[in-house]
Amino acid sequence: MTVSPKLGTRHSLEVLKVIRNGLLLDGGELGEVLLPSREVEGQTLGPGDSVMVTLYSDGEGRPMASLRTPRIQLGQVPLLKVVSTSKVGAFVDWGMPKDLLLPFAEQKGPVREESWVLVILTSDREGRLMVSAQLDRFLSDTCQAYQQGDEVSLVAAHSTDLGYKVVVDDHAW
């Protein structure tokens, strides 16, 4: 079974054709996805070749591809740096050509440029990528069954009267 490519994730996609602007890739349900020529300078890729890319959308909502590896993928919970603020929210750097919006409604409190925020990558009702700091809406209060000695990834979220609240494996508190 083939996994359908989703925005905010990395996938190996097949090159369909070479065009003036870059390469058109087979994005499955997303349709043709552009990998801009500036991303593939010096590489010889052609129809039938596979290339590992990160999928995101441009300013007009069209799916795009990049060879860059982002700092966050769909469903992950890292600290990201706020690079600017605007009348719709803040923008965080995820290592891709277009910064991600952290809308005011998704903030835990006001954020400033150069601050770091703990966020999860998700999408809005229209399917556009965004981040949220309202982690309670996305994380479970119960962890999967772990065995003693299992490795987990932890991200400290904030302190409480009892200690620190941590995110376990990007999906639970």
Give the ranges of each region predicted by the language model.
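Single-stranded RNA-binding regions, centering on S1/OB-family and related RNA-binding modules
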Residues: 1-173
